[in-house]
Amino acid sequence: MRGLGHEGERDFQIIGGAKPVRVLVRLHRRVLFKLNAPLQLGVTSYCGAMPSCSEKTGSAPNPGSSAPAPAQKKTARCSSLPTHFIFTTPPPPPVSSTLQKGPTGAGCVTAARPAPSSGRQGGGGALYLQFSVRRGSFVSPRAPRAAAQRTCPFSWHRIMSARNV
C-alpha cells in the first residue's frame, strides 16, 4: 500500500454507467472522491448500509441509499465505508415541469431554486462541483451543464438546498 501515498486511502469501484470507473476514497479527515470519468452520474447510493452516517444527515432518503457528501461531513464518525458505490443515470424526463414537481426522485429538489442557484454559481453539476471543491473534499472533472440539469442528482441538490436555506 506504499504506492498510494497516504495511510487511509483505498481504491473503490463504481458500478453503473457505460463501464465501471475507478474512484479513490481517502479515509483521512475528509473523504476524497476522485472520478476518472466525466461526471455525468445521477443518483448516487451506497452498496451497503451506513447507519452511523445516514442517521446524522437529517432526512435520510431510502435505507439503501445514502449520499456521499453527508459522509464527507461526518467522516470522523464513520469508521468504515462500503466497498462499492452505485452511480445510476436516470433517463431525462420528457417534460421539464415534471422535474419541478419531483415525482420520480423522493425529495429531489432539482428545480426548486433554478434562478438563484444557476445565476450565482453556474448551474447544474458545476454548481455542486464548485461548492464542494471550495470545501476541499471533492475532486472531479467539470460536469456538462445540460446533462447535469437533465438528471436528478438527489444528494447534490439536497446539499445545495440545505446550503441555500
From Swiss-Prot:
Stretches the record annotates as Disordered: 53-123
Instruction: Output compositional bias ranges, type Low complexity.
Output: 58-71
Designated name of the protein: Uncharacterized protein TP_1030
Report the source organism: Treponema pallidum (strain Nichols)
